[in-house]
């Protein structure tokens, strides 16, 4: 009624065990393009094809895969999250699993306790926090904060604003867009620091500039110019 569809599944005791023979419910729904989807479950997954509007989904155990939606708020205690395109804002969290987003047209907040976090292109401010796993961002057009306790951090192209990259154990590979001046503040507890950037004059008011703060407790740091051809082609691309 009122343009809403509510789906509920019975909570049988067998569905909460990891042993075979448990009960399960599979639901397939055809929705108009741009529909809103809200849901939660103890053990449930979500797979969407096509374009959704606002999508909020939370599960204790299960994978979440969307082609396109926005804004999105997705959380799983254990399982992968994969999004083709997020619009407006993306708030994504997994306790254990791979987290990939091809493109965020807007801002993003990413949390991953155990697993890699791989982002293609993001147009707004981005924050990524991880406990165990590498962080990779192909291209960022605004500020980036990327922190992991254990894992490498790769930023394929940054172009504007404050960039913070911190890892307790791992390498930093940060590339600045060609022609954009950058201020560098780089420290590693054990390892080398390399910068391929030439000295540049102070930018004029209103001119794009990047302020980079890089920290590694154990690992090398490399700063370079991004190749002209860099574009977000795959969130899973390795450096």
Model-identified regions with their sequence ranges:
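Intrinsically disordered, low-complexity terminal regions
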Residues: 1-239
């Amino acid at each position: 009624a009122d343009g809403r569809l509510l789906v509920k599944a019975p909570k049988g005791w067998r569905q909460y065990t990891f042993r075979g023979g448990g009960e399960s419910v599979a639901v397939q729904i055809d929705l108009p393009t741009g529909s809103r989807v809200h849901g939660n479950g103890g053990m449930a997954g979500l797979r969407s094809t096509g374009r959704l509007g606002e999508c909020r989904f939370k599960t204790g155990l299960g994978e979440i895969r969307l082609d396109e939606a926005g804004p999105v708020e997705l959380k799983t205690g254990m399982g992968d999250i994969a999004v083709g395109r997020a619009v407006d804002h993306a708030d994504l969290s997994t306790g254990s699993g791979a987290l990939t987003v091809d493109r965020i047209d807007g801002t993003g907040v990413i949390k991953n306790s155990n697993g890699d976090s791989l982002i293609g292109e993001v147009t707004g401010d981005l924050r990524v926090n991880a406990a165990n796993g590498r962080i990779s961002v192909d291209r960022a057009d605004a500020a980036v904060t990327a922190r992991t306790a254990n894992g490498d951090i790769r930023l394929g192209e940054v172009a504007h604003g404050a960039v913070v990259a911190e890892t307790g154990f791992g390498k930093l590979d940060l590339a600045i867009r060609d022609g954009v001046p950058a201020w560098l503040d780089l420290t590693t507890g054990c390892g080398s620091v390399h910068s391929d950037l030439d000295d540049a004059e102070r930018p004029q008011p209103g001119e794009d500039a990047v302020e980079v703060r890089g920290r590694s407790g154990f690992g090398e740091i490399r700063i370079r110019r991004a190749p002209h051809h860099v574009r977000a082609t795959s969130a899973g691309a390795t450096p």
